[in-house]
């Protein structure tokens, strides 16, 4: 449930554990301020367990995997973000939403072969590039060498995302405008 703070266009998040007592008893909830408040380098999160037995089993697993708890600095930073970051988040969400609008409008008008999928949460947007009729390798090479863009390849997230590329829209609008112009020029050159 990590991207639940990054909801777009008035969407609401329903925590999985709130659906029923039976579901709550079998749900481990993970939350983090790292994506929402750009604190990813702190590598910090919070895990909520429904019962002590499940928590104990995970602590044993974490110990075997040599995964440590959050450090003192990351805990203070997360607390500060949640306590003092509301104004920043209130400005961030419409900005990212505006970036999504820009991408959708730009593609519809200039690159109709690429169909952006507006997410309900997070700042990552899938671009459906299947109309370009490229293999995964061709699509990767096209984005890197022709468009000069380093996006995430969809197929690495599962076979159903072959032909998709993942774009990070949490950046200045000028960066997106440049990226979209580069993408248009690359598609036009096909």
Regions flagged by a language model, labelled:
Residues 1-18:
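Conserved PLP phosphate-binding loop immediately N-terminal to the Schiff-base lysine helix
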Residues 7-9, 117-120, 157-161:
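A short beta-turn/loop motif at secondary-structure boundaries
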Residues 20-97, 104, 187:
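Conserved core segment of the aminotransferase class I/II
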Residues 23, 142-151, 157-190:
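PLP-dependent enzyme catalytic core of the Aspartate aminotransferase-like
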Residues 51-52, 131-133, 172-174:
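Helix N-cap motif at beta-to-alpha junctions
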Residues 79, 94-104, 116-129:
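Conserved glycine-rich beta-strand-loop-beta hairpin in the small C-terminal domain of fold type I
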Residues 104, 113-116, 150-155:
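A short linear hydrophobic-aromatic micro-motif
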């Amino acid at each position: 449930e990590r991207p639940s703070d990054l909801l777009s266009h008035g969407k609401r998040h329903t925590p999985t554990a709130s659906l029923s007592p039976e579901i709550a008893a079998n749900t481990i909830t993970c939350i983090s301020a790292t994506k929402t408040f750009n604190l990813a380098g702190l590598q910090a999160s919070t895990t909520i367990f429904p019962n002590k037995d499940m928590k104990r089993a995970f602590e044993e697993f974490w110990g075997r995997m040599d995964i440590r708890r959050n450090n003192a600095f990351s805990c203070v930073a997360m607390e500060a973000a949640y306590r003092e970051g509301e104004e920043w988040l209130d400005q961030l969400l419409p900005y990212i939403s505006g970036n999504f609008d820009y991408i959708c409008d730009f593609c519809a008008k200039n690159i109709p072969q690429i169909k952006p999928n507006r997410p309900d949460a997070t700042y990552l947007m899938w671009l459906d590039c299947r109309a370009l009729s490229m293999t995964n390798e061709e699509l990767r090479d096209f984005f890197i060498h022709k468009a000069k863009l380093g996006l995430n390849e969809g197929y690495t997230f599962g076979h159903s995302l072959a032909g998709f590329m993942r774009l990070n829209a949490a950046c200045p609008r000028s960066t997106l405008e440049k990226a979209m112009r580069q993408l248009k020029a690359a598609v036009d050159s096909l």
